[in-house]
């Protein structure tokens, strides 16, 4: 049949509801950015002045790094939806690698800029990603983000000694 004929006509509600999920909440299975958002929110709450718990923020960064390492092994081009006959029916945009880096680290970098512990763990996560991601474009994005982290340290209220320490990666985020 012609494409126009196949795409015209009434929509079977039963088939539509079987193909598309409707709900009031985002899920990790349907929206990969949601997983990052949850963990980033944990880190941000830990970094808030009322809580002031950089260790919890570091633990959140551990999880974010793990998510990014796993994601780095996957193709992040457009998403494709096929019908039961393997006919392409839907193409939908997916976040790019840089979008995930921004989501994962921007707010933590901003709100954790004055914590040597947090900055060192962020640096370690980024260096770890440059070693685990194989795509040159993605490695370049991580290296650009490392430069952004250096600029953040330069503008922070940390003392010169603390800034020097913050430029050294620390996998455990001890801040020493």
Located regions from the model:
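Short basic (Lys/Arg) and small-residue
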Residues: 3-176
């Amino acid at each position: 049949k012609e494409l126009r004929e196949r795409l015209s006509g009434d929509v079977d509600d039963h088939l539509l509801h079987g193909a598309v999920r409707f709900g009031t909440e985002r899920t990790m299975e349907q929206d990969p950015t949601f997983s990052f958002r949850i963990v980033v929110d944990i880190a941000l709450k830990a970094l808030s002045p009322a809580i002031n718990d950089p260790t919890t923020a570091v633990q959140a960064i551990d999880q974010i790094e793990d998510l990014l390492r796993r994601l780095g092994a996957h193709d992040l081009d457009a998403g494709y939806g096929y019908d039961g006959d393997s006919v392409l029916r839907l193409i939908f945009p997916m976040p790019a690698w840089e979008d995930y880096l921004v989501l994962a680290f921007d707010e933590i970098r901003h709100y954790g800029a004055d914590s040597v512990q947090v900055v060192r763990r962020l640096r370690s996560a980024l260096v770890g990603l440059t070693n685990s991601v194989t795509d040159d474009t993605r490695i370049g994005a991580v290296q650009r983000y490392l430069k952004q982290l250096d600029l953040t340290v330069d503008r922070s209220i940390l003392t010169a000694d603390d800034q020097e320490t913050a430029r050294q990666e620390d996998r455990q985020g001890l801040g020493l």
